């Protein structure tokens, strides 16, 4: 179950109306001290632990970041399965411009 307390309406709409891929978990993260805003999506762990990566990209808004993370995580599930790996799919999307956000934490 995903805790979406306080999530913006556009993010909730994306989560509940665009996720036809049956994701296991979606986590919205924010750390004000470091400036981190991120979405972590786990599509499937049916074959094993989720395997994926992180995208650090200047996405326009949180709803687009959620949609991006959902699509990328689903794609990782399919790629891992087709490669014969015993892993599911997951992906993290960090919202921000890596050229401008240069805190030590990030």
Curated annotation (Swiss-Prot):
This is Valine dehydrogenase. It comes from the Bacteria. GO terms for biological process: valine catabolic process. Belongs to the Glu/Leu/Phe/Val dehydrogenases family. One of its GO terms (cellular component) is cytoplasm. It comes from Streptomyces ambofaciens. GO terms for molecular function: valine dehydrogenase (NAD+) activity. It catalyses: L-valine + NAD(+) + H2O = 3-methyl-2-oxobutanoate + NH4(+) + NADH + H(+). Keywords: Branched-chain amino acid catabolism, Cytoplasm, NAD, Oxidoreductase. Pathway: Amino-acid degradation; L-valine degradation. PROSITE patterns: GLFV_DEHYDROGENASE (PS00074). The active site is at 91. Its EC number is 1.4.1.23. InterPro entries: Aminoacid_DH-like_N_sf (IPR046346), Glu/Leu/Phe/Val/Trp_DH_dimer (IPR006097), Glu/Leu/Phe/Val_DH_AS (IPR033524), Glu/Phe/Leu/Val/Trp_DH_bac/arc (IPR016211). Oxidative deamination of branched-chain amino acids. The catabolism of valine is the major source of fatty acid precursors for macrolide biosynthesis and a vital source of antibiotic precursors. It is found in: Cytoplasm. It is an enzyme of class 1 (oxidoreductase). Homodimer.
